[in-house]
Curated annotation (Swiss-Prot):
Keyword set, alphabetical order: Neurogenesis, Secreted, Signal
Domain Cytochrome b5 heme-binding: 35-134
Name the record gives this protein: Neuferricin
Highest taxon in the source lineage: Eukaryota
Length: 263
C-alpha cells in the first residue's frame, strides 16, 4: 500500500462507513408504523422449546427470528440464554449467567458499544428482523428512547476512534519483534511490518501516546515531508523523525532498520 494512497484508502473507508451508518440508523432507529412491537413477557415465549411459537432474540431492542440458527440458540444450546430476551450486555461481557443476560449497556465503553453495533450488523445480515422490543431501547410507540439515542452517539464515537486508530497505524506501523533466551530481543521494520503494506520501510522508534503507561515500538518514515505537513515545500526531508512523541532506542543506530538488544 502506498503511503499517500494508503491514507486515502483509510479516509475513503471512513466516509463509506459513515454513510452506511447513516443508512442503518434511519432503518434501525426510525419510525415504521408497520413494525411489530413486543413486550418482554411476549418475547419470553419465543425460546424455541416444545410448544413455543418460535425462536427469537433481541439485541438493542431489535427482535430477530433465529430459527435458522436453532442449533446455537435452542434449549440446551450454548447460546440458549439469549433466546426470548434482550441480553445485549452479554454480547460484550461474555457473562451468560442470569445476572449477566441483561439489556443494560450502561458503563460500556465506546469500543464495546461498537462491538454491539457489529453484532447488530451480523444479525441484520444473517437473520430475519421481526420487530422491536418495548422497554429500555424502544417506547410503547415503537420510537427510540433516550438510552438508544445515547447508544447511537457512542457508536459514532467508536467509529471515529477506529478511523483515527487506522490513520495512526498508517503513519506509524507497529514494528516486528522477537525474543529468544539465546539472543535477546530484536525489533525491526519492513514494508509489511504491523500488517501495513507500504512503499517505505522505516526505522524503529518508541512512540509515547497520551494516557499510555508504556511506549510501544513503531516504524518511522525517514525521508520526505512530515505526515502532517505533506504540502510543505521547505521540509527537512526527515519524514516523521522529528515528531516530539518519538524517542530513539538506546544502543541502536538512529537510522538502523533493525535494533538488537542482547541479554
Amino acid at each position: 500500500m502506498l503511503r499517500i494512497c494508503g491514507l486515502g484508502v483509510v479516509l475513503s473507508l471512513a466516509v463509506a462507513a459513515a454513510a452506511v451508518l447513516a443508512v442503518w440508523l434511519m432503518d434501525w432507529w426510525g419510525s415504521h408504523p408497520s413494525i411489530r412491537l413486543f413486550v418482554p413477557e411476549e418475547l419470553a415465549r419465543y425460546r424455541g422449546g416444545p410448544g413455543d411459537p418460535g425462536l427469537y432474540l433481541a439485541l438493542l431492542g431489535r427482535v430477530y427470528d433465529v430459527s435458522s440458527g436453532r442449533k446455537h440458540y435452542e434449549p440446551g444450546a450454548h447460546y440458549s440464554g439469549f433466546a426470548g430476551r434482550d441480553a445485549s450486555r452479554a454480547f460484550v461481557t461474555g457473562d451468560y449467567s442470569e445476572a449477566g443476560l441483561v439489556d443494560d449497556v450502561n458503563g460500556l465503553s465506546s469500543s464495546e458499544i461498537l462491538t454491539l453495533h457489529n453484532w447488530l450488523s451480523f444479525y441484520e445480515k444473517n437473520y430475519v428482523f421481526v420487530g422491536r422490543l418495548i422497554g429500555r431501547f424502544y417506547g410503547k410507540d415503537g420510537l427510540p428512547t433516550s438510552e438508544l439515542t445515547q447508544v447511537e452517539a457512542m457508536v459514532t464515537k467508536g467509529m471515529e476512534a477506529n478511523e483515527q486508530e487506522q490513520r495512526e497505524k498508517q503513519r506509524f506501523p507497529p514494528c516486528n519483534a522477537e525474543w529468544s533466551s539465546a539472543k535477546g530481543s530484536r525489533l525491526w521494520c519492513s514494508q509489511k511490518s504491523g500488517g501495513v503494506h507500504r512503499d517505505w520501510i522505516g526505522v524503529p522508534r518508541k512512540l509515547y501516546k497520551p494516557g499510555a503507561k508504556e511506549p510501544h515500538c513503531v516504524c518511522v518514515r525517514t525521508t520526505g515531508p512530515p505526515s502532517d505537513q505533506q504540502d510543505n515545500p521547505r521540509h527537512s526531508n526527515r519524514g516523521d523523525l522529528d515528531n516530539p512523541n518519538l524517542e530513539e532506542y538506546t544502543g541502536c543506530p538512529p537510522l538502523a532498520v533493525t535494533c538488537f538488544f542482547p541479554l
